Every structure is written in structure tokens, then in C-alpha cells.
């Protein structure tokens, strides 16, 4: 076969490379009458060709242009600049790496490709055989040998990515971890199969999930009796948490890697996929949207308040898309489409910040609510265990008296708020609450309520100052494997009934004053639908019991989820937690006052500034559709820009 070599860059002439021999070893005798053209060039020329014919705005090592003819096979372009860099990084000579590029290009001219794993295995196998005949080693051996380092590094990025959330608040670690994982898993242009992309991303997803949710198994060991029964499930629980992450948190990386799109479009796909996963976590299998990426911005009031515009969904889309766009700009050394993506997400963030600044201003307006006293008992779960019915009854009576005593002098207080499950007796809908009667103040208290059909609710009971229970709210989002058993063969400590969903409640304080609030029991505060969008409320009343989690990160992250709820809804939060953190939270997510973890005491306060945000007005699902449209529209513009 005849090989025509064109020296478009004179630097090539100093290398003694037999291009004709290399090309003929590839084709053998089958193409002895054929011709191929090899042009030896530099990064500038191959960059222009790569952009013109492949829509890739960057240089590459080799380009092949197949003519589809048995005589004129086609043209191969090889860049000396890229070959020199890659040869230096691989620790081989320029001549050896050039031989590989010729072999690689020749197989492209013969119709081989590497768009899928199966294609890559066939093509790489043939390349290795030819290079062995030429006396060169397997160029893919190092990649295969050291591939495990990428898995380790990806897993490490996942493990430390959770440090951006409370109580550490090292947001830059999360940003760098996502950027590092994106660089390893998504930034390359080569397409890989869905399953290979998934396997590569599993270490990040699994380690990210375990490092972020490990504290959930802490609850097993709070009470010795429960520990004896459920400790055996610790390891399966951690494995399950890892599997959860390997399924959900890898989706953005997998899609950005296995879908063959232009580099400038990838940030829109990646950010959109991150928002999709968060939206899915809001409702799939009862939902668990804990720690959206948006929450790493809570240390910055103006940035986090952009959630009042487009919610955690929108801020997650913007933050993750911005991270990906920065990586693509660095990886590709610029490019119009990459710069467009970067500017798009920066502008989106600035728009959110502008709206957030407005939300902060509005949150400082309005009249104060009624004075609420939060009671934080800090009773351990173990101390609630009784050995007999008599002990249990006596213990419950003692605890009622302790709760009354702990409330103290309430003459300057309008309402007394107790945390989740603090009332030691089960209540019926027509029962009275003696604590309210004794204090002569309306009381909101966490209790188990048994309705007339003997269904048991984890509830917020509301009693007037006469002691009469006038209303109760049953928790709607129950904790899987804790408050109910979604899988029959896996035991659960309780089997409670789910309530009817988000609603508005009120207390008539006097003739002209009514305190209107939205109840949220425990982790219901993490869901975007905690407040019905068409109703005005003075506050969200959130009762919780984080005694199960002690001083683990989960307790502090739960507090941040309440702050997120305040920002998204534009409604201040009054939060009573059994062991802390109890707090008054402004409508802008600002902590007005709080009782730390493990501190017994009371906290008096008022809230103001409740208003309607654009996020609450449109709702979670509408904003999800808007975000997806922006992802598609932005990606299309980036594609057209690159094209």
C-alpha cells in the first residue's frame, strides 16, 4: 500500500518514523493497491479541523477521514504538540506514540470505532496486536493497570463531599469534590456504555450516601432494648444506604458520561440530572430529599435566599451546572459553548441572588406574631423505658408534672410549644390536655393520638387554655423502617398511620387575634410541600425529637433543612426539638434564637415577615418543569453555539 506523507509542520522531520511500514502492517496484503494520506501537523491545524468536522473546539491527537473507497482509504492527521504531551505523560518516545496514532487512525479508516465498550474492546485488541508486531508495548496496559486508582479517588471524592453540609459547612470541599468526580467521570469526550459509566460512578455515589446518612443507624443504639433487637441490622442498613447512593447519586454522572453530546451541553445535562434526582427524592418511596446540594450555600444568606425564587431544585441545578461548566472550560481550554454555559449559570445565580436579597428585605417586615415559649426537655430515650405497666404509669405522671414545671412562669407567654412525642400518654380526639389547663395557656404538644378507629398517629395536638384538645395533625411523611415497615420481612419498631397531608391550623388567641400556622412533625420539614401554597400562615410549627441521633451531623442538618423550608416558603419556622436544636427561624432562614443540643430550658420569641415566595406560589412540580425547560433550552443554545 502506498503511503503519502505530508509535512505541514517541519518539526516532524527530525523523527525517524517509517509510516509506510506501520500502515502496511495494519492492512496486510488485502489493500496492497490502496493509498492513504498521512498529514503531520500541529495543534492549531488539528484544532481547526476538529472544530469544523467534529464540533469539538479543542485540539486532539489524531483525526481520520474515511473516504469509503477500497483504493483511496482516506486521510489521517496527527498533531505533534498533542503527541509530545501525551508521550511525555505516558513516559514513552514520540516515535512510539506516533506509531500508535497511525495504527489507531488506520483502523478508523478500515471502519472500526470505539463509541461503545464492545467496539472499543475489538478495536483496542487489534491495535495491541499490530503494535506488538512492530515491537511496541500495549498502550492501554497502564490505563487498565492503574484504573483502580480512579475508583479509589472517585470514592474519596464521594466520602468528603458531605463536608459541605452542617455541622462542618465546608462548602468548598463539596464543590471541589463534585468537580473532581466530574473531571474523572464526565469531562472526556469519548463515549462509554451505560453500564461502564455506572460502574465507574458507583464509588462516588455509595461513599457520598454513606458519609451523609451514616448517622441514621445511630438511633439503633440509643436504647439498649432496641439495640439488642435491631443491632444485627446495622451492617445491612449501611449497605442499603450505599446501594441507595449507587442508584440515585450516580445518575447525573452516568448520563453526562454515556450520552454523546458536545462538551458545552454537558453542564446543562449534569445540572438538570441533579435537579431531577432531587425532585425524585421528594416523593419516590415516601421521599427523602435530605441535604440537597443547595444547602451548602446556607452560610451565605444572599445566595441561599435564591431558593425563595426557584427553590432547592433551582439552586441545585445552578450550582452543579456551574461546577460542571468550570471543569469543561478548564478541560477544553475555553471554547464558545463552554463559555456560554459558564456565563448562563453565573447569570442564573446572580438573578437568584438578586431575588434572594429582596426576600431578605421582605422577611424583616410585618408585625410580630404571638409570643411562643418553646420547651426543650432533653429527656433521654432510655429513661422512658419502663419495666412494668405500673412503672410506666407512674413515670408518665411524673413526666407530665416535669413538663409543667419546666414551662415555668408563662404570664408573659401566649402559647407553649412542646416537642414531638413529649406527652407521655396517648390522646383521643376528645381528650383534654392537663398541661394546658394547669398553665392556663394554649398548648401545642407532640403526642400519639388514637382515633375512633384505633389508628395511631404521631401527632401535634392543639389544646386551648381550658385543657380541651381542639385539633390534631397526624404526621403524613412517616419514617420507613422506623414508624412503619414498607417491607414485610424487615421489622419496624412501630406501625403508625399516615396523616392526610399538609394543612393549616389555627388558635383563637382572643376576639380579634388568631394564630395561623402550618404543622410539620419531625422530618416533614424537609419536604417542599410543608406549606399549602394558597394559604397565609404566621409560621411553620415544627416539632421534632432528634434524641435518636444525639450530636451527630444529622441533628445539625435537620436544623438546616428547617432553614431551607423557611426560605422556600417565605414563612418563619418555630421549632421545638426534644434534645435540641430548638429555634426561632426567620422567613429568610436566619436563626433568630436557639437552644443548643443537650440544653434543658425554654426559649421565648416571636416571628414576623411571613410572605408568599415565587417558589411557593408556583410549587415544586411547576418549578421542576421550568428547570427542565431551561436545561433543554440552554443546552440547545450551547449546542448551536458550538456548532
Segments from the language model and where they lie:
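CN hydrolase (nitrilase-like) catalytic-core segments centered on the catalytic cysteine
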Residues: 245, 272, 415, 421-445, ...
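Membrane-embedded alpha-helical bundles of multi-pass enzymes
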Residues: 146-362, 551-552, 565, 577-582, ...
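Short, conserved active-site loops that position catalytic residues or coordinate cofactors/metal ions
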Residues: 167-180, 208-219, 376-377, 412-428, ...
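Active-site-flanking alpha-helical
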Residues: 98, 107-112, 219, 285, ...
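Soluble catalytic regions of membrane-associated enzymes that act on cell-envelope
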Residues: 355-480, 504-519, 523, 531
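Short active-site segment of divalent metal-dependent hydrolases/proteases
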Residues: 103, 107-111, 215, 281, ...
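Active-site catalytic loop in hydrolytic enzyme cores
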Residues: 218-240, 273-275, 279-312, 456-528, ...
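An acidic/histidine-cluster motif and surrounding catalytic segment
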Residues: 1-98, 110-145
